Amino acid sequence: MPKMKSVKSAVKRFKVGKNKIKRGSAFRSHILTKKPAKRMRGLRTAKYVHSTNVKAVEKMLGI
């Protein structure tokens, strides 16, 4: 049986580390002028996928 294909959009969005899946922050693409610098600094840092979504993301990545 052939290997399962991973979802290519998911491969571009997520990085797999030590037992955790890293993701980028949302709300950073446009209309940035009205958002405070403090908020933008917080959004710059990487986040981890929430435990409720890990199973779905792993399935997309073929893990």
Curated annotation (Swiss-Prot):
Any single GO CC term annotated in Swiss-Prot or TrEMBL for this entry: cytosolic large ribosomal subunit
Is this entry keyworded Ribonucleoprotein? yes
Lineage, top-rank taxon, reads Bacteria
Recorded hits in InterPro entries, A to Z, give:
Ribosomal_bL35, Ribosomal_bL35-like, Ribosomal_bL35_CS, Ribosomal_bL35_sf
Alphabetized Pfam families for the sequence = Ribosomal_L35p
Keyword field: Ribonucleoprotein, Ribosomal protein
Listed GO biological process terms: translation
Which SUPFAM superfamilies does the record match to this protein? L35p-like (SSF143034)
Q: Which GO terms describe its molecular function?
A: structural constituent of ribosome
Q: Which HAMAP family match?
A: Ribosomal_bL35
Q: Which family does it belong to?
A: Belongs to the bacterial ribosomal protein bL35 family.
The name under which this protein is listed is Large ribosomal subunit protein bL35
